[in-house]
């Protein structure tokens, strides 16, 4: 057992093969009630992982036993952090400081935790530290979810804290800035890694505060970044808050009633069609939806290097077997403000939703959701960071959303199986975290062999060149036909038009 003194208390850690794992660091506390900013907690670590945050309902197509366990174990007091530190970092703290990886998990802003599937090695930092040969520190953490983490709207703006989950994440990056040197880490070499909601969160930190506040990381890995487009914060977003309050028995009574409500009331209310959940414009931290902020120049300009990736099939798992052209039109109408009829009609034409076509409904829906929620976010961040970015498509067995997480967190000793493709894949990411370049430390003595990975090609091209395609047989460079310029230009234009139409560009 190792005990480390931080400035606010003692932290205990267990050790596994030279990696000290300090779990359930009580980094943040919620002393003043719900939907407020958290603060550092002074309690000491007790060696357990700590409870996860209260989730929303399972996402269609992603039901999993681990989510059921999360629902049973979850508590409001959930803001804990796990630090995986190689022994050499603690023994040699006066010498070389190590790069730090901070993982932001996905789950649609409604599900997930830092140790959701820890038994299978998912989000277990021991393996990554060992694969990095002790040359990196890994941090994982919880953040508030569902209604408790992402309610927004004008009532929240006036009485509470919109995007509380995003503030929780920011507090962790501040903790890393303030304390990671005591664990042998280098606060100037922090990499933010995230998938799905985690990737969307990282993009939101890049545009937060109109891009004038340091997000506290220099490198980023953004995998399948998921973001909705809740533009109308005074209209549909506020109506979402009112509907939630009504279901919780607090209609017309403001946030004070919700803060006093029994947690079971809030959980039940969040399970009944909560609607869009995730980073939402609040007029303060997030000025606009991500694509609009990028177009307006509201982004942090001083990142050193990024890896951006998507899987072969992002949208497919979100399209039900009973989907119709009408239900896909309903997806657009429910995500855009009610006044955005022209934008919706334009997209209905673009995706052939008004009349049957030769393309199957499932294929249309998959493409629509892919573009709207995932890949056009990739095109948008690359508009500003193409000269510092590496682009990847993860394609083994025509991979669907989330499957690349298993490759990133691959643990050969825990899984009792060797998957060389996953080992090579990991080496790109760890090389990037340690050096800023995925090529420097990539595994060259492995089969299938890794290959040189150049930065992404001309951002003005319809298809992005130099995309590293990860397939069952290895790696190759392709032109990416899923992040199309014409498609994403259309989406960005329409989001700008709708934002302006609602009167939000001048707010």
Swiss-Prot record:
GO biological process: lipid catabolic process
Source organism, top-level taxon: Eukaryota
Gene Ontology molecular function terms on file: triacylglycerol lipase activity
Gene3D superfamilies per UniProt: alpha/beta hydrolase (3.40.50.1820)
Subcellular location: Secreted
Sugar-modified residues: 262, 321, 358, 416
Signal sequence residues: 1-21
Protein's UniProt keywords contain Transcription: no
GO cellular component: extracellular region
UniProt keyword terms in alphabetical order: Glycoprotein, Hydrolase, Lipid degradation, Lipid metabolism, Secreted, Signal
Enzyme nomenclature, EC number: 3.1.1.3
Catalytic activities: a triacylglycerol + H2O = a diacylglycerol + a fatty acid + H(+)
Active site: 196 (acyl-ester intermediate)
Family: Belongs to the type-B carboxylesterase/lipase family.
PANTHER family to which the protein is assigned, alphabetical: CARBOXYLIC ESTER HYDROLASE (PTHR45570:SF1)
Name of the protein in question: Secreted lipase ARB_01498
Organism annotation: Arthroderma benhamiae (strain ATCC MYA-4681 / CBS 112371) (Trichophyton mentagrophytes)
């Amino acid at each position: 057992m190792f005990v480390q003194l931080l400035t606010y208390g003692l932290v205990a850690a267990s050790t596994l093969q030279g990696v000290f794992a300090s779990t359930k660091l009580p980094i943040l506390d919620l002393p003043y009630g719900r939907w407020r900013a958290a603060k550092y907690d002074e309690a000491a670590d007790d060696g357990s992982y700590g409870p996860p945050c209260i989730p929303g309902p399972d996402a269609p197509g992603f039901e999993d036993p681990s989510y059921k366990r999360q629902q049973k174990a979850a508590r409001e007091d959930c803001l804990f952090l796990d630090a995986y530190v190689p022994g050499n970092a603690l023994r040699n703290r006066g010498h070389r400081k190590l790069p730090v990886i901070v993982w932001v998990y996905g789950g649609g802003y409604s599900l997930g935790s830092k140790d959701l599937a820890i038994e299978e090695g998912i989000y277990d930092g021991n393996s990554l530290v060992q694969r990095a040969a002790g040359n990196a520190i890994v941090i994982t953490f919880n953040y508030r979810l569902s209604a408790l983490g992402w309610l927004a709207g004008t009532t929240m703006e006036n009485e509470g804290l919109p995007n509380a989950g995003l503030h929780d994440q920011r507090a962790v990056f501040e903790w890393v800035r303030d304390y990671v040197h005591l664990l042998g880490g280098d606060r100037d070499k922090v990499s933010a890694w995230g998938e799905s909601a985690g990737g969307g969160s990282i993009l939101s930190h890049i545009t937060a505060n109109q891009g004038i506040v340091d997000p506290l990381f220099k490198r980023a890995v953004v995998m399948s970044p998921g973001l909705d487009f809740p533009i109308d914060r005074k209209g549909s977003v506020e109506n979402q808050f009112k509907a939630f309050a009504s279901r919780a028995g607090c209609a017309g009574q403001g946030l004070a009633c919700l803060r006093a409500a029994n947690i079971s009331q809030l959980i039940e209310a969040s399970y009944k069609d909560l609607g869009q959940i995730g980073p939402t414009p609040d007029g303060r931290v997030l000025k606009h939806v991500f694509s609009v902020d990028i177009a307006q120049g509201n982004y942090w300009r001083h990142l050193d290097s990024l890896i951006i990736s998507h899987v072969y099939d992002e949208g497919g798992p979100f399209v039900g077997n009973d989907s119709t052209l009408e239900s896909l039109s309903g997806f657009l109408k429910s995500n855009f403000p009610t006044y955005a009829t022209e934008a919706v009609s334009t997209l209905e034409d673009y995706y052939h939703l008004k009349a049957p076509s030769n393309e199957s409904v499932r294929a249309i829906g998959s493409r629509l959701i892919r573009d709207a929620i995932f890949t056009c976010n990739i095109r948008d961040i690359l508009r500003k960071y193409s000269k510092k970015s590496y682009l990847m498509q993860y394609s083994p067995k025509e991979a669907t959303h989330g499957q690349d997480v298993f490759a990133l967190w691959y643990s050969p000793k825990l899984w009792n199986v060797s998957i060389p493709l996953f080992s090579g894949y990991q080496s790109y990411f760890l090389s990037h975290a340690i050096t800023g370049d995925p090529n420097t430390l990539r595994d060259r003595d492995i089969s299938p062999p890794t290959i040189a990975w150049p930065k992404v090609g001309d951002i003005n091209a319809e298809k992005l060149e130099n995309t590293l395609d990860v397939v069952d047989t290895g790696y190759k460079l392709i032109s990416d036909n899923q992040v199309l310029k014409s498609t994403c230009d259309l989406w960005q234009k329409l989001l700008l038009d709708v934002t302006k139409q609602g009167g939000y560009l001048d707010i």
